UniProtKB/Swiss-Prot annotation:
Residues engaged in binding Zn(2+) 2: C163, C166, C189, C192
Alphabetized SMART domains for the sequence: DnaJ (SM00271)
Biological role stated in the UniProt entry: Participates actively in the response to hyperosmotic and heat shock by preventing the aggregation of stress-denatured proteins and by disaggregating proteins, also in an autonomous, DnaK-independent fashion. Unfolded proteins bind initially to DnaJ; upon interaction with the DnaJ-bound protein, DnaK hydrolyzes its bound ATP, resulting in the formation of a stable complex. GrpE releases ADP from DnaK; ATP binding to DnaK triggers the release of the substrate protein, thus completing the reaction cycle.
Cofactor note: Binds 2 Zn(2+) ions per monomer.
Keywords assigned by UniProt, alphabetized: Chaperone, Cytoplasm, DNA replication, Metal-binding, Repeat, Stress response, Zinc, Zinc-finger
Lineage of source species: Bacteria, Bacillati, Cyanobacteriota, Cyanophyceae, Gomontiellales
Name of the encoding gene: dnaJ
Protein name from the UniProt record: Chaperone protein DnaJ
Subunit structure and binding partners: Homodimer.
Annotated organism of origin: Cyanothece sp. (strain PCC 7425 / ATCC 29141)
Binding-site residues, Zn(2+) 1: C146, C149, C203, C206
Renumbered ranges of CXXCXGXG motif repeats: 146-153, 163-170, 189-196, 203-210
Length: 374
């Protein structure tokens, strides 16, 4: 008994076209004969193609839903007949373009210039470095074009020859007949590994790769206002390209270390300051730490616990516009003494009487509760 086409693709019976397409891409890549050499993979691949051919067409899908396999016998074209398959041919070609594509029209030369790979470098910054920016020196290792052979991979005085297997195309084609039609498979040339050239006398410096690993120092400019997750791009500092292609880029990912005193919230900086109950009642002026150094902070009379006071323009510069800065927000914490002298107690009790506060049972703590809204 034939397997259910929905089960073959691993989708529900109400799956939409996008769900079908995604399932097909995933399974076709997994079971393609060039990728999967296990026994039964080719038959599984044929099942997947048959199921997608039927279900991707609304008309044949409707017949299949009503009559099953009997309703679509002979309806599918088979994956060798790309001319009548419309969108199916497009998706099939796009899926396998990574290893050669399918059909006579999909052959692509792999020779010629190719861009180098991009590289990633993780960089830790101190809290203040992220706020104000500056320069950092880093050490990276990347591939550069071999200076001995100028990237050809061949020993100086010699040059690569055209691959005799693929004729310089970098790909070979193999025609296979299946129950579903003729299948032309294009794959990377096994002789030259897709380069189209064979190096007989390899460069002694790079071993025929045309590239060599080099460790170098770079100065990175850190803009003011960066944060964890900010990514900086350094052009052309990735791996060198091949066959004269451009180099890739270096991407520097920033990670900002925590500060024991300050926290960051967007472009604002947060910190705390402890004051005495007398400073809270009478008001005060005191020096507090900011990223710019010590700054005078005014404590208004009657300041309540957890009041947030603002020092404008002492926060983080706005990334891309360092003239504009956030604020420094300071949370006021109140220090209530656990012990006081007899003289202090006497004075506080006199003050409580003047205010008309009863402090009998709660003692002087009850007085503080009244004063600070407790």
């Amino acid at each position: 008994m034939a397997r259910d086409y929905y089960d073959i693709l691993g989708v529900s019976r109400d799956a939409g076209q996008e769900d079908l397409k995604q399932a097909y891409r995933r399974l076709a890549r997994k079971y393609h004969p060039d990728v999967n050499k296990e026994a039964g993979a080719e038959e599984r691949f044929k099942e997947i193609n048959r199921a997608y051919e039927v279900l991707s067409d609304p008309e044949t899908r409707a017949r299949y839903d009503r009559f099953g396999e009997a309703g679509v016998s002979g309806a599918a074209a088979g994956y060798g007949d790309m001319g009548d398959m419309g969108g199916f041919a497009d998706i099939f070609e796009s899926i396998f373009s990574g290893f050669g594509g399918v059909g006579a029209g999909t052959s692509r030369r792999r020779t010629g210039p190719s861009r180098g790979d991009d590289l990633r470098f993780d960089l830790k910054l101190e809290f203040r470095e992220a706020i104000f920016g500056g320069e950092k020196q880093i050490r990276i290792t990347h591939l550069e074009t071999c200076t001995t052979c100028n990237g050809s991979g061949a020993k100086p005085g010699t040059k690569p020859r055209t691959c005799g297997t693929c004729g310089g195309a970098g790909q070979v084609r193999r025609a296979t007949r299946t129950p579903f039609g003729s299948f032309t498979q294009v794959s990377v040339c096994p002789t030259c590994n897709g380069k189209g050239q064979v190096i007989e006398d390899k460069c002694e410096t790079c071993g025929g790769n045309g590239q060599a690993q080099v460790t170098k120092k770079l100065k990175i400019t850190i803009p003011a206002g960066v944060d964890t997750g900010t990514r900086l791009r350094v052009s052309n500092e990735g791996d060198a390209g091949q066959q004269g292609g451009p180099a890739g880029d270096l991407y520097v990912y920033l990670f900002v270390q925590e500060d024991p005193e300050f926290r960051r919230e967007g472009i604002n900086i947060l910190s705390e300051v402890k004051i005495s109950y007398l400073q809270a009642i009478l008001g005060s002026r005191l020096m507090v730490n900011t990223v710019d150094g010590e700054v005078e902070l005014t404590i208004p009379p009657g300041t309540q616990p957890n009041t947030v006071l603002t020092l404008e323009n002492h926060g983080v510069p706005r990334l891309g516009n360092p003239v504009s800065r956030g604020d420094h927000l300071i949370t006021v914490l109140l220090e209530i003494p656990t012990r006081i002298s007899a003289e202090e107690r006497e004075l506080l009790e006199k003050l409580a009487k003047i205010r008309g506060d009863r402090i009998g049972k709660g003692g002087i703590e009850g007085f503080f509760g009244k004063v600070f809204g407790g």
